Amino acid sequence: MVNIVVFGAGGTAGSRIVREAFDRGHRVVAAVRRPEADAPYLPAGVRVVTGDATSVRSVRELAPEADALVVAIGGGDRTLWPDAARTVLDALRGMPAAPRVIHVGGGATLLDPAGTPLLDDPDFPDEYRDAALGQAEALDVYRSSADGVTWTYVCPPPLEFHPGERTGRYRTGTDQPVTDAAGRSVLSYEDLAVAVVDEIENGRFRNMRFTAAY
């Protein structure tokens, strides 16, 4: 059994990660900004607490309970994700037995065959660009860290990523999208949660990013 704290546990990705981890028998703490609003939608038996990944104090209060700390936050402006990355690293720096950090990132940070980030493509949808830039900055924060905190940055597909079915199947890659025979990169939120919890259990991608798709 792994002790897991999930920041953003009330969100689309975070809530599914909570359920996947809980269903596998792990001890899960769901950190949300409004416990009274989110608790009814999370599994009974999960402890729901007030938590903010952009607060050093909040992270330090919850980190001692965790073997893995998941950052699955959304909303707000593009500064949210790099601010959270810096905060979490600052909070864990120097902590004995600091938990691993699993950051649910942005698929647009992945690279095309020429090595260019997908978010730099002129055809990349404008409505997603701001969040993509913020997630790219968060990845840079993790990559530039040298404080002994182990992190993993998880990329869903760049565009075709929606709530759907849990199949328990996916394939992984590192710097480029994983595509099917038709050239599409697709994954459900439910199977992203499977990939995240698999990574918590197995630790294949330490101090690097990975992506998952069918």
Predicted segment positions?
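N-terminal Rossmann NAD(P)H-binding glycine-rich loop of SDR-like oxidoreductase domains
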Residues: 4-24
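Mid/C-terminal beta-alpha module of Rossmann-like enzyme folds, strongest
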Residues: 7-10, 101, 175, 181-214
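N-terminal Rossmann-fold cofactor-binding loop
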Residues: 31-36, 52-53
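Conserved Rossmann-fold cofactor-binding substructure of NAD(P)-dependent oxidoreductases
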Residues: 47-66
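NAD(P)-cofactor binding segment of oxidoreductase domains
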Residues: 71-104, 133-137, 141
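Catalytic loop of short-chain dehydrogenase/reductase
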Residues: 103-143, 154
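Glycine/proline-rich active-site loop of Rossmann-fold NAD(P)-dependent oxidoreductases
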Residues: 115, 148, 161-168, 199-208
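Conserved beta-loop-beta element that borders a ligand/cofactor-binding pocket
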Residues: 140-162
